């Protein structure tokens, strides 16, 4: 009976290890943007602003708490896809007028000068995430707009990282 009791939890651990689902993490990092993408193969890609370095303590935490096969570092992109979800990142340029694109998540970075109410009219079924690179006054204004329009809002400054699977 003992071999069965030991083998069952071990097999569940192996199944979980081999079936990691891809995920995108939007981190809170003061005055900058940091995303991490986990592939199904447990490869991690850290996305930062151009010429921005990843804090060593964050890398150490990921290495100790996650099963990491490989780590990469790339510059942030405006559009990400995780499983069937599309993520649009709007930075200080405020460019989002994409007619045939309907993102599931919108990440606001570097305090873009946008009319959030107008943008939410264009993308009514989206979730809004504000990362740590935004001014607090902008984040407060966006949060009240989302609350008024009943759109889910996540502030990484208050609630920590956001995970999209």
Question: What does each model-identified segment do?
Answer:
Residues 1-22, 31:
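Glycine- and aromatic-enriched alpha-helical transmembrane segments of multi-pass membrane proteins
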Residues 30-165:
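Extracytosolic and intramembrane catalytic regions of membrane-associated proteins
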């Amino acid at each position: 009976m003992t071999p069965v009791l030991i083998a069952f939890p071990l097999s569940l651990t192996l199944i979980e290890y081999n079936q990691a689902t891809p995920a995108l993490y939007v981190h809170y990092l003061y005055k900058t943007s940091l995303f991490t993408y986990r592939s199904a193969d447990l490869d991690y890609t850290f996305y930062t602003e151009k010429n921005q370095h990843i804090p060593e303590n964050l890398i150490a935490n990921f290495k100790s708490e996650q099963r990491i096969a490989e780590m990469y570092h790339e510059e942030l992109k405006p559009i990400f896809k995780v499983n069937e979800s599309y993520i649009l990142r709007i930075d200080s340029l405020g460019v989002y007028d994409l007619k045939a694109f309907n993102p599931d998540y919108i990440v606001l970075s570097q305090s873009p000068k946008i009319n959030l109410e107008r943008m939410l009219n264009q993308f009514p079924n989206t979730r809004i995430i504000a990362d740590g690179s935004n001014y607090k006054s902008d984040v407060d204004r966006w949060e009240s707009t989302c609350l008024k329009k009943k759109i889910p809002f996540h502030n990484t400054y208050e609630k920590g990282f956001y995970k999209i699977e």
